[in-house]
Amino acid sequence: MPAPAVDSSRFRHRKISVKQRLRIYKSHEIKDLEQEDVSAISSQHQQRELMEIETGVEKNEEKEEHLYKILQSNQLRENKKDLFIPTPDASKTWDEFDRFYQGEFKCPTSYIQFSAQLEDCCGTLYNMDEEDEIFLADLNKSLADSVEPLTEDEFELIMANFESSIKDRQPFLSMDPESILSFADLKPTMLKNDVGDSGVKKELAKEIGMPEDEPFLTMFDNKRPLGKREKNMETLIELFGEKIHDHWKQRKISRHGCDIFPQLKSERNNDKDDNDPYVCFRRRELRQPRKTRRIDVQNSQKLRLLCQQLEYTKDLALTVAKRERAVLEVLENEKFVFQARAQLKTMKRKLGIDADNEDLYSAKKQKLVSSVRTIKQQQQLLLQKQLQIQQQQQQQLQQQQAAITSDSSVKRAKSSKSSKLHKEDSGLYADEKGSEPKKKGPKTGSNKNKEQSLSSAQEIGAQSPVANVSNVQQQQKQASSQVYVKLPNSKIPDIVLEDVGKLLHSKEKSTRKFVEDRMRKRKQEDGDIFFNLTDDPYNPVFNLSIPDNVSPQDAPFSSVAGSKFEVKTSYYSPNLQNYITGTANDIKVFNKEGEAVENNEYKKLEFFNPFDNEIHTHSREFPIAFRRRRGRFNMEYIDQRKTDHNINDMLLQFIDLDGIQKQELDNDVINVYDSKLDDLSRSYYHWKYDSNYNIYGSKFSDEPAKLNQISNDTQVVRFGTMLGSKAYEQLRDATIKYRQEQINKRKKLNSLQQQQMLQKGQQPINNAPHSQSSSPPSHQDTRKNPGSTPNQSSPPKKHVTPNAAA
């Protein structure tokens, strides 16, 4: 008998599949089924179906008693007034709140920076409490006057070293806290550990190349007076190790061998304890599979790029530190040389040595020329080299021409000149000129070229020397570019090649002309009656200003929104070009004396682009207020309003221009977050990009948390862990894939080697019968092949196993 369904809209009966397990009841197991209460069967059926419906809550949380009852009441539509989840009462106030929390938060001018990773790297993991403060005060009082007192940072460093060394030596100290090691046993381990800034500074000193004994400061070190050196771990342990060990031992025993400051508990791979309420981070076993991994790939690529950029910045900082270290060494060497020269000079005067003082004076330093050259400088150098080569070639040609003219007579020169002029006028080609060497006698091709260049130079003798140089260069280019065959002018097509810039310029020009023609036609149709605002593109809501008398609820979505908003239109104006060039007649300019100025430069419109990065100037000027009034003959005047207050004092309330100027003139290396000039430049863009609210009033960053119905902090933690887990999974899959490929390659190589060994082992076995039939085996053959016997009747060993062959 099927159980009746509670509600067809709430439950969906699924089809019975082959993979689903069904329970089979026998006849003797079900007795008096018709007499049983139908309501009991229906309630059991309802409870069974309720457990199978997804509630949107994790499976572990569904078993909670109060939540389970509420979910059942929601599905069964029962009365829910008496059901609730008990929560602690948070309505009570704390009377001593003002005693412990004092002061008011002041919003800083720059962004608030915080980095937990940086704090962990630069500071110790041990924090002092009241007991440590009392012990440190007593310890400093008991010290001698010659010994410097122990600071809080040094005390925390020693305590953290004790904690880390005891974890390495006695990891199971909580089983027997009284068996804690003595100071003599822990001392070697403490000297090896690098706790806090000391280990980081040692590695940094090795990379820069500085000696370990030489002190140096970083940006993260605390400010201390000059001459006071930082104590290393060895000196701290020698001075205060035993005294602090007794105090640390007492605190460790009181904590039963555990950490003095308890750490956050997290769930490991194998250790799973759902009953421990102090576990703050648990592993999620079930994870919804995602359909695409494109976002994961993009995030991993961004992380790789960020890692590369950080490595580049680290290398750059190290190279700068090495350079400054080299400069410091140079200065120290110069100082040492100067002091040695001063001592040498005094010694010479005492001993009365009269010698040259060349050693006392250093030679003048040569000016350092940077080897870095820009593209323009390289191009200029190439041009200079080419000009020098051309000048050398011209000088060689002139020398050759002078030698030829001295050898030849004046008559032959005149006859050759007249003959060449006659041939050029008659239009003879190169084949007719080629017959000249036969008439004049045996001459080489070089002499022929020399005579031709000489004749051409004599013909252009009346021209300027610059023209002669250009002609010689053209002849050299023609002589060097004789590789390809020249086509006659009749066969060369007259094609003018157009580049992309010209095409885009013409296209933009045609589109502008088309739009301007359409706007001019629309202007003529409308006339001077009204401006047509329907030609403008639709402006978004956040770029428009709403008047006070219009309700903002229905205005952005109404049909008459264009008439309610104050929109900056872009309608057509026929006199706009005159306003831009300053040739408009309806604009007049007057100077301070009231005289009209006819210069068109003062009539031009000034264009301002608020999104241009280069137009912002940081100055002490204050915005000036103007007013418009009409005078006689309906003339329109613009006056400047007078301000009673000092505009510079009012501006300095918001911007510290003196501090910015002082910081820039100091010319020190400034962190980008501490730069006041950068803070001022960011303030210009605060109104554009730093809006935390949308048109509905809620923060943009809270929208994903609202969609998931969780808090914003939980959403941030979930998103960060998701990125980390996805990147780790991708890296793990890549390593597994790479290892599988290497294993497959290794298997293929092994199989190929085994096949080659099998083939080598089968070759002597196949050749054995032929050698036996041709000639009996000798004594030497038996020595070489001990496996073969002289008995021919014995069958050869054809079956060779791979192991034997190997």
From Swiss-Prot:
Residues 403-461, 751-806 are annotated as: Disordered. The keyword Cell cycle applies. Residues 751-779 have a biased composition (Low complexity). Keywords: Cell cycle, DNA damage, DNA repair, Nucleus, Transcription, Transcription regulation. Disulfide bonds: none annotated. Component of the NuA4 histone acetyltransferase complex which is involved in transcriptional activation of selected genes principally by acetylation of nucleosomal histone H4 and H2A. The NuA4 complex is also involved in DNA repair. Involved in gene silencing by neighboring heterochromatin, blockage of the silencing spreading along the chromosome, and required for cell cycle progression through G2/M. Residues 421-439 have a biased composition (Basic and acidic residues). This is Enhancer of polycomb-like protein 1. InterPro entries: Enhancer_polycomb, Enhancer_polycomb-like_N. One of its GO terms (cellular component) is NuA4 histone acetyltransferase complex. Residues 411-420 have a biased composition (Basic residues). GO terms for biological process: DNA repair; regulation of transcription by RNA polymerase II. The keyword Endoplasmic reticulum does not apply. Belongs to the enhancer of polycomb family. It is found in: Nucleus. Component of the NuA4 histone acetyltransferase complex. Residues 785-795 have a biased composition (Polar residues).
